[in-house]
Amino acid sequence: MEHHEDLHLIVVSPESTLFDGKVEIVTLPGELGSFSVLYDHAPLISTLIKGEIKYTEDELEKSIGISSGFVEVRDNIVSACVEI
């Protein structure tokens, strides 16, 4: 029996909401290297560096280019506040 769980990804900049929706996986450009977040990931807070936030939505990989920011992961919600 296959059971699929989703994360909720929210990416905001000072100007607008860049993405707000369900994703299967998100990969973020952390200060110590890129890292991926899946469903039921441990809580964390991290700074983000220049790079791309990559995520899979409806089996399609998409990305958002950023210059810096920070991210919080908690209760299957990935909240990123970024500069683009």
Description of each model-found segment:
Residues 7-84:
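Compact, glycine-rich, soluble single-domain proteins
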Residues 1-6:
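Short, charged, intrinsically disordered terminal tails
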